[in-house]
Amino acid sequence: VRPEIVAIGAVRTPLGSFGGAFRDVPVWDLGAAAIAAALRRAGVAGGDVDDVIYANCRQAGNGPNPSRTAAVKGGIPVPVPTHTVNMACPSSMKAVMLGWQSLALGEARIVLAGGMESMSTMPFLLKNARWEGFKLGDRTLTDSWSDTIDPLVGYGMGMTAENLAEKYGIARDEQDRFAAESHAKAARAQDDGLLDAEIEPVRLPPTRSDPDGRVVARDESIRRETAAAKLAKLKPVFKKDGSVTAGNACSMGDGASAIVLTTREHASALGAKPLFSIVASAQTAVDPAVMGEGPAHAIPRALERAGMTLRDMDFIEVNEAFAVQILANERALGWDRSKVNVHGGAVALGHPTGMSGARILVTLDNVLRRHDGEHGVASICGGGGVTTAMIIRRER
């Protein structure tokens, strides 16, 4: 009989805006903050963890196995192994899935999973300089953001969003209205303190002007003044006559998330109160040209494995890479929008890619508790057409 796997600690950092509060913070320090907080909330010592499975997508300049650095700095002893997961945007949810599988196989008793990202510290690259040298002529400085271009299709995620708009007939004004509502929901949730339970404040390093170090406790990218009429004035970014803009797409950012997993039996032995149990998960891959429709494939597969339907889900968290992507999946799945991203999504909060998959699980757990739900599903798509989905049940 497969053991039941539960989460006993789940947390995220605030989401810093691109070039914002975390601009100069190394990615492993963000990861360490989330890891230390998850251990503390779970009541687990770092030495009790058997494995750390942690994600980081934008790894240029972050050293070998950057999650190992984050783990040790976050209180995990040196003898505990760590590996870094990269599955594009679903990476940290995949890390949770791998942790779940490791526990179910009896290979570990406690696993820490999650992910981190610092988009603000992504470097510029001088490719081929090692071999071509600098004797004469110009050289091109390449932004490591070029890694977001999918070689399978030859363009970035923004064009895949434009493809979705065309495929599903989603107009610009519908995207702008959705984006404005995402910001409005996030602002209300922040103002009402609904996000506080899932966030662990981060203290920045001391500076001359702030010798104690500033404490960052709130998400930075939420724009309270956002309205569809304002968004309508923005120009398309990815296609001359397109509909996807900086306003109806997710923003870049920095942050980390972490979840402590164990078996129900071991949680009982520890005297730890489970937050949620994992019911089922799934991963799928679709045409990279329309990568954003992945949740429409992964969610039904996870539901089938759980023997449940979408109507059984009290709440749904789908990462908002683009407003059009959520609307496309809504057309495909026919979900009740009032259940989706009720505290706002990545269009408002930001999308630090390596941490978002676990972040939406942390958020879903918080939403289920805040609004007295029992079951929820989370899903996230990624470059190359990969997608993950996970169903969780709130523990009472």
Where are the model-predicted features located?
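Condensing-enzyme catalytic core mediating Claisen C-C bond formation in acyl metabolism
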Residues: 1-25, 227-293, 297, 304, ...
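Active-site-proximal alpha-helical scaffold in enzymes
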Residues: 87-117, 165-194, 258-265, 330-331, ...
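Conserved catalytic cysteine-centered active-site region
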Residues: 56-110, 151-157, 225-251, 332-360, ...
